[in-house]
Every structure is written in C-alpha cells, then in structure tokens.
C-alpha cells in the first residue's frame, strides 16, 4: 500500500530546495491588540522546524 501525505502537515510545512523544513510561527492570527508589538514583531517570518521534529514531519510528508 502506498504511503499517503498527511494533508494537515502539508498545509503548515514547506520543504526548501536544500531539503530543510520551514514553518510559520504561531500566535499571530488574532487577538493581537492584547499582545505587545515587540512580541508580534518577533513572531514575524518563517522559522526552520526543530531537529527533534524533522524526522517525524518528513515521514508525515512522505519524504522519508
């Protein structure tokens, strides 16, 4: 039986050209007026998935 891609993970994580996994940071969708602007600035941009989670994420994406 073929492995299937976990669609929830596929929507949240992208694979770069070099094979790294990147994701958006949480806590920047709503209720922002109660959060300090320093915090919302710090949460900007994309970050690499931690090495502890990379193996599991790749398996969910069907890359390993």
From Swiss-Prot:
The keyword DNA-binding does not apply. SUPFAM superfamilies: L35p-like (SSF143034). It comes from Corynebacterium efficiens (strain DSM 44549 / YS-314 / AJ 12310 / JCM 11189 / NBRC 100395). Residues 21-30 have a biased composition (Basic and acidic residues). Belongs to the bacterial ribosomal protein bL35 family. Residues 1-14 have a biased composition (Basic residues). One of its GO terms (biological process) is translation. One of its GO terms (molecular function) is structural constituent of ribosome. This is Large ribosomal subunit protein bL35. InterPro entries: Ribosomal_bL35, Ribosomal_bL35-like, Ribosomal_bL35_sf. One of its GO terms (cellular component) is cytosolic large ribosomal subunit. NCBIfam families: rpmI_bact (TIGR00001). Keywords: Ribonucleoprotein, Ribosomal protein. Residues 1-30 are annotated as: Disordered. HAMAP family: Ribosomal_bL35.
């Amino acid at each position: 039986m073929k492995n299937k891609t976990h669609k929830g993970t596929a929507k949240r994580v992208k694979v770069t050209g070099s094979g790294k996994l990147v994701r958006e940071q949480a806590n920047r969708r709503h209720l922002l007026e109660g959060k300090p602007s320093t915090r919302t600035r710090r949460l900007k941009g994309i970050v690499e998935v931690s090495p502890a989670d990379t193996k599991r994420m790749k398996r969910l994406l069907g890359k390993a």
